[in-house]
Amino acid sequence: MERRQFSALAAGATLGLGLTRIAAAQDGTPVTARDYTKIATPLPVATPAGSVDVVEFFSYACPHCFEFESTLEAWLQHKAPEIRFRRSPVPFMFNHGNFQRIYFALESLGQADAMQKKVFDAVHVEHLRLDKPEDIAAFMARNGIDATRFMAAFNAFGTGVKSAQAGTLYENSGADGVPTLMVQGRFLTSPVIARGEKKALATVDWLAAQVRAGS
């Protein structure tokens, strides 16, 4: 094929791709590199057949995560049943080790969901640092959590392992901020990427449907 013919075909293909992206943008369909990004090397997921893994990378220290929480909670009440949602606390800003351990300790006691908003409020509304064991224990006791059991879980070896694994997962995903949502170990979106909290969650819904459809 002559260079001129090849250039014409390449230009046509590029134009076609551009028109496809424009059409997708106009009808509200999420567009890669605009509403979400693809993870260069997809990460393994352990979900049952027919389910889609969705991970929220977050930190209790992050003000944007705090702001996102109410929108996320509303979405969780109505998400598609095939979506298997889980949270993954990441090392972020000051006190990150404690915040990761707080989440995983609560998770081990079956209290993570019930305490999620309360911990966020403690940090961003009450401005508690939660950086000393006695302060953490007192906060948990005030909220109906057995302080002795909680601190045992907080200091457990397994909690440290989970915290390290969460940090590795975040690093391997290629995410560069929180809150970020990872879908099936293949895609990332966020309120920043999708330009809005609800748009990010709508993008998650769309990506989950694509995964279910085998795309």
Predicted regions and their residues:
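Extracytoplasmic thiol/disulfide redox context detector
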Residues: E2-F94, G167, A209-S215
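Structural microenvironment flanking redox-active thiols in thiol-disulfide oxidoreductases
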Residues: H78-L109, D113-A141
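C-terminal cap of thioredoxin/glutaredoxin-like
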Residues: Q5, R142-S215
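Sec/Tat-exported extracytoplasmic proteins
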Residues: A61, L76-K79, L106-G110, V123-H127, ...
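Solvent-exposed loop/turn segments at secondary-structure junctions
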Residues: A61-H64, P91-N95, A122-V125, T159, ...
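Extracytoplasmic/secreted proteins, especially bacterial periplasmic and envelope-associated proteins
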Residues: D53-E56, E67, T71, G97-R101, ...
